């Protein structure tokens, strides 16, 4: 393709509303343009990259035996009401009415639609297992769309849904999708990790996320230094300490800590490391009373000062909960936040159950709030000064940290940042039971089908790839994602017939050899030409100049290379093939 036929819509300046690198570079390189908040038009260059992702996804899904369908973006409210999600979904579900005042929504996901299709089309166990997939536009009315296509309101997604008669069949398809996803991200040239994950709002019993590794990633993932274990930090188990609790050595003291409320402030003021401070978090647990009505119960949660509360883990212990307000804390503890603790509770305070992370059990000579403004206790010890919570209240409630033992017993954990680009679930019967999606089993009896759900954020993959592959000059595409493989850059071709003739011949030969070439036939300075090609990230650049032709050579530079090199004109095709295959 010639640049005279394929205009480059590059920008010199970084748009002011672009916060992260991928958003900045997608705009500057001319991949996308913003239409409205969270809505983007894909320009020709960006669409070429998007189509490359789609092609690899489609090939691997087909190879895994999945069947492609295409479902409507607009979905009737009745199906969402039948599943119960019409009321459960928040304002991110965009709802609308047609001219007959019938309610619809713009699909953020397609569980209801595919389950309705399955219950109407699948009648017998002989039709199972089956796995349907689509590559389709989704819409979620995010309250604050950010980061370009990374968190847009409208996005392209591959979603697949499988149907099964038994758990063994579901597990087999789940494993096949795990392999297919690994193949997809490997073929795209991305560094990634599959990790154990929480099933979240989608539901189900088993789940893995696929993360592209990038320092800018929003998610923290934990992985073993020795084994293949990897999990989202929300899911990774923090093992119970194996060392015994040290014996007390310090006397219990009430110490003045004026204005020192945070762990960091108390640590610095008392000269005590954060892991020697007991942190008390107050929450309101939703429980059902004898009349079947919801009510709040005040609960305190204890953690080591250097550990973070894992809200997902706490939710699995308590069910529904929210963090207590300052007024609620004062009403129940007799003290404002910053000084609360499990020791020296004022008489008559209505403190509910006390839960503690397992690491708390081996603390000794620690510091905790004194339930009095401006004071803490030091030298606190379990059993001597206050009872340790019973075993049923000692739980894994924290995020793992670097250096923790791996939950599989092999090595220690490291923490990396990742961008979630894929998620697979074993859904079970959550949707099939709600929509009565059944088939006749071998005995001729009606049986609810088991379901699996498998998603890839196709447009998000493009942004994630840039977050992982860029430098100060622009995008550094993996070979499989680049919009073009080769940039052909003739210098002063308008004034040099020899350069122009050589460029035309090379363009024809490279194209015939199967390379996708961007032939820069613009009348621009070499510096502008090179800067644009580096910005848009083409892996291989060939420069044709009078000086090079005098010695029978071309100038080559790989996008990831630091230096240029000379190559013979006659061997350019074989050279590029070797370079492409080695990456």
UniProtKB/Swiss-Prot annotation:
- What InterPro entries does the database record attribute to this sequence? aa-tRNA-synt_IIb, aa-tRNA-synth_II, aa-tRNA-synth_II/BPL/LPL, Anticodon-bd, Anticodon-bd_dom_sf, Pro-tRNA-ligase_IIa, Pro-tRNA-synth_IIa_bac-type, Pro-tRNA-Synthase_IIa_type1
Q: Which residues form a coiled coil?
A: none
**UniProt entry tagged with the keyword ATP-binding:** yes
Supply the PROSITE patterns for this chain: AA_TRNA_LIGASE_II
Main enzyme class: ligase
**Where found in the cell?**
Cytoplasm
Q: Does the keyword Protein biosynthesis apply?
A: yes
Among HAMAP family, the record links this protein to:
Pro_tRNA_synth_type1
Q: Describe its function.
A: Catalyzes the attachment of proline to tRNA(Pro) in a two-step reaction: proline is first activated by ATP to form Pro-AMP and then transferred to the acceptor end of tRNA(Pro). As ProRS can inadvertently accommodate and process non-cognate amino acids such as alanine and cysteine, to avoid such errors it has two additional distinct editing activities against alanine. One activity is designated as 'pretransfer' editing and involves the tRNA(Pro)-independent hydrolysis of activated Ala-AMP.
Family indicated by similarity = Belongs to the class-II aminoacyl-tRNA synthetase family. ProS type 1 subfamily.
Domain note: Consists of three domains: the N-terminal catalytic domain, the editing domain and the C-terminal anticodon-binding domain.
- Put simply, this protein is called Proline--tRNA ligase
